[in-house]
Design a protein with these regions (language model features):
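Phosphopantetheine-dependent thiolation modules in NRPS/PKS and related acyl-activating systems
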Residues: 2-38, 52-53, 57-83
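Residues within the DNA-recognition helix of helix-turn-helix
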Residues: 46
Length: 83
């Protein structure tokens, strides 16, 4: 499958639902920590879900730079492009 930013975002939004108990609308500008109250454990669980869904590895070293949904989609796209 050819992944576009929109398709990746759509899939990540689905994966985020268990971490979004308040049902906040997730946009590219959604702050994962402030808006969704994700802690480091939740973030690692999400990363594992993303790795399984997209069949990629997300280096832990990239996570401190991921604040928004847009950042997360960019990381996924970058890892997908590495094949």
């Amino acid at each position: 499958m050819q992944w576009t930013a929109d398709k990746v975002q759509e899939e990540v939004v689905k994966l985020l639902q268990p971490f979004n108990p308040k049902g906040i609308e997730i946009t590219p500008d959604t702050d994962l920590s402030a808006d969704l109250m994700m802690d480091s454990v939740a973030a690692m669980n999400l990363v594992m879900e993303i790795e399984d869904r997209f069949e990629i590895d997300v280096p832990i070293s990239l996570l401190p730079d991921v604040n928004s949904m847009r950042d997360l989609v960019d990381v996924v796209l970058a890892q997908l492009s590495k094949g």
